[in-house]
Amino acid sequence: ETIKQKNEKVIIFTEFRAIQVFLKRLLLERFGLNVTTVNGDSNTNRRVGLTRQGIIDKFQETNGFNVIILSTVAVGFGVNKQKANHVIHYTRSWNPAKEDQATDRAYRIGQDKEVFVYYPTVVAEEFSTFEIKLDKLLSSKRELADDMLKPNADLKNELFELLNE
């Protein structure tokens, strides 16, 4: 409701077709939106200008509140979605780099609003849910990747010593 009142755009990422269909129906019932879904089954035809980026461009060109449902695998790389400033990872990828790449598409040149990223999570007091465990795993993978890509001073010195031997 808050996003609708602000007339902002939303990208929802999920790989699962059943969830895509469910969300599309829910958004139609709740907001009267005919939501576009782009996934591996999306028909694309370059000759008539129907490409995944073309479908996303059409979404971006509409004024006001709108939602698009995307598959991270189908559109995580190589397309820009900077008119949307709300990114919802409805289901999570096992690979944090894919998630980050998909999210980063909303931060491209032309984005003039603050970007909000959401990870809906089921929480239970009695036990650690799958979503909580997956979030911890993805955070750990991100930290490991950051450590390898941006080594601290000790690791840098150790690497230089190994290279100079």
Roles of regions detected by a PLM:
Residues 1-26:
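Conserved helicase/translocase motor-coupling segment
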